[in-house]
């Protein structure tokens, strides 16, 4: 069982005079987040303890139980991420997912929060077993893969797995910026231009690697 750090403080309940909370909010606003996002994702922070000096982004499963959290430095003085010693074989933000409509897969939590709609961050470049099984056993037909440009080979590898299971796969061609840098509107434009992956285009992509 995973729990939030005992020092966790929800951002939305922070007083307007809290210097630390205001610094964190400024950092998150700069990344395109809003007060509504703070509530939606229950974003918080720690000022002390193992995760002191970090923004905490929790994830909840389909039953709204905590299944993981990401701890991100907001002041540049630490390693960027310090995650809990818990299994990553989970579906991040699962409580927000509708398994009957197209799903977007991206790398990180900030990418997911920028994309906003029916998106799952895979926390890196590899697909968890739980997520893979959930997708292939549900009615979702279309999968959009939006990994960073340096992970094109991984995107194709993931796409091929779903293609072999009869899913429709679209590769979102990102520029040098990742979704969290692009923002919602720019990313939406890119997803509308996403190319469907088939055996022929898969082979062509592989030749380009």
Which functions belong to the PLM regions below?
Residues 28, 64, 145, 179:
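A residue-level signal for conserved active-site and pocket-lining positions in enzyme catalytic cores
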């Amino acid at each position: 069982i995973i729990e939030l750090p005992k020092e966790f403080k929800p951002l939305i309940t922070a007083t307007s005079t809290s210097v630390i909370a205001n610094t964190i909010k400024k950092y998150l606003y700069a990344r395109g987040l809003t007060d509504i996002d703070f509530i939606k994702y229950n974003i918080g922070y720690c000022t002390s303890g193992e995760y002191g000096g970090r923004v905490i982004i929790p994830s909840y499963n389909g039953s709204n139980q905590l299944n993981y959290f990401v701890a991100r430095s907001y002041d540049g003085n630490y390693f960027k991420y310090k995650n809990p010693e818990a299994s990553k074989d989970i579906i991040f933000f699962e409580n927000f997912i509708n398994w009957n409509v197209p799903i977007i897969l991206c790398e990180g939590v900030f990418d997911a929060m920028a994309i906003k709609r029916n998106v799952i961050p895979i926390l890196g470049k590899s697909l968890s077993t739980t997520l893979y099984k959930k997708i292939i056993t549900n009615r979702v037909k279309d999968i959009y893969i939006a990994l960073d440009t340096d992970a094109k080979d991984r995107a194709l590898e993931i796409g091929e797995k779903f293609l072999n299971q009869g899913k429709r796969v679209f590769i979102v061609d990102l520029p040098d910026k990742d979704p969290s840098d692009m923002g919602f509107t720019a990313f939406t434009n890119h997803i509308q231009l996403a190319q469907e992956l088939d055996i022929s285009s898969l082979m062509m992509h592989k030749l380009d690697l």
